[in-house]
Regions:
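A conserved mid-protein helix/loop that constitutes part of the nucleotide-sugar donor-binding site
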Residues: 19, 170, 179-193, 213
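Membrane-proximal helix-turn-helix segments that form the acceptor-binding/catalytic region
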Residues: 102, 107-131, 139
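Nucleotide-activated donor-binding/catalytic signature segment of Leloir-type glycosyltransferases, i.e.
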Residues: 212-234
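Acidic donor-binding loop of glycosyltransferase active sites
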Residues: 244-259
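Short hydrophobic beta-strand element within catalytic cores of glycosyltransferases
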Residues: 269, 273-277
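Conserved acidic donor-binding segment of nucleotide-sugar-dependent glycosyltransferases
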Residues: 289-290, 294-300, 309-314
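A short, well-ordered alpha-helix in the C-terminal region of glycosyltransferases
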Residues: 302-305, 309, 316-330, 337
Length: 344
């Protein structure tokens, strides 16, 4: 089958939104399909939004037997056999409209843009043969904002067999983009309240230097700089595998994330427990409190208690890690299941 994988991308910004497309491409090719990736650039600027939407609308993929669309606004592409694996809305116009992350005024002009966008999204989503999401969180948003029913289809990682458990040192690792909404600052602030010598390792690239600088200053001011390793870059896969093999646990504490996130899944493949928070969204679909990880209130004191608990009770941490790995099978997070559903 000839399959086109369609998505948008932010130039020079990597992340899970690229992985889901590129890893699916490899899985489809391994199953004997002919695959093309179709990317168009996306810039978060309201005045460019409709031009970007029109660019997708005029893409001609008639040569494909089927298209699978991921990141907005790729779902606007026309095709008689359009499948959508929806990973998030343009959130400032949806669930982040009333938050600090909107980034533009809630005036008449932007309300008009918001309403027109939602109308166009809903119409394009209705064109699909089938709509999947990457989480129940996103399915709930599709139902709430667009009146669209969708099936959660959890994205696996590539090369899951490379992740393994080797030991448990004194580090809690957080490997993801370093951005304010990922809340690495919450982890650094929490370390100040820890009573154990637990350490923190933050790995990932940032879109700018301001937030990274603020993390370093926070660590210095809190007197915990000697217990925070801050690696502002995309570490290699080999480094990631090593960090997860040896760490005490992983932490992933974003604000109302769309899905459980690859950091959660990679840690589980390494049989390590995951620390998250009650307002983190998608990770709560995977993490079960005190079963395969810990869920804390999003305050430094509460997160510190969880970090200390992971450190002081290594046997419980080991047991939760084993359960985290088993959770992957419980939720059918594997490429065979993904292909079966997308190609049905």
């Amino acid at each position: 089958m000839k399959i086109a994988l369609c998505s948008s991308f932010v130039p020079f910004v990597n992340g899970g939104y690229r992985n889901i497309v590129e890893w699916l491409e490899l899985a489809l090719q391994g199953a004997g399909h002919e695959v093309e990736r179709v990317y168009l650039p996306e810039v978060d600027a309201p005045d460019l939004l409709f031009k970007q939407m029109a660019a997708f609308r005029f893409v001609d993929l008639a040569a494909a037997d089927r298209i699978i669309c991921f990141r907005p606004q790729s779902h606007l592409i026309r095709h008689p056999h359009k499948i959508i694996w929806f990973i998030h809305h343009l959130r400032p116009f949806y669930d982040l409209w009333d938050s600090e992350y909107r980034g533009f005024p809630a005036d008449t002009e932007h309300r008009g843009i918001r309403d027109a966008l939602r109308t166009a999204d809903t119409a394009a989503l209705h064109e699909a043969k089938k709509v999947f999401s990457n989480s129940q969180v996103v399915s709930d948003r599709l139902r709430r904002y667009n009146g669209i029913d969708s099936e959660p289809l959890y994205p696996p990682v590539l090369g899951a067999e490379s992740f393994h458990h080797r030991t448990m040192n004194d580090e809690i690792v957080c490997i993801c983009r370093i951005e304010h909404h990922k809340r690495q600052h919450l982890l650094v602030e929490s370390l100040k309240y820890c009573r154990t010598p637990v350490r923190l390792r933050l790995c990932g690239a940032a879109s700018g230097s301001d937030y990274v600088g603020s993390l370093a200053r926070t660590a210095e001011e809190a007197g915990v700089a000697d217990r925070v390793a801050l690696d502002n870059r995309w570490i290699s896969q080999e480094e990631k595998i090593d960090h997860l093999a040896d760490c005490l646990a992983a932490a992933y504490v974003p604000v109302d994330e769309d899905s459980y996130g690859y950091p959660t899944l990679e840690a589980a493949h390494a049989a390590k427990p995951v620390l998250t928070t009650t307002d983190s969204g998608g990770p709560l679909e995977f993490v079960l409190n005190e079963i395969n990880g810990l869920i804390a209130e999003p305050q430094p004191e509460a997160v510190a208690l969880a970090m200390d608990r992971l450190y002081t009770d290594k046997e419980a941490s080991r047991r939760m890690g084993v359960n985290a790995k088993a959770r992957i099978d419980e939720l059918k997070i594997d490429w065979a299941h993904v292909l079966q559903r997308l190609l049905a």
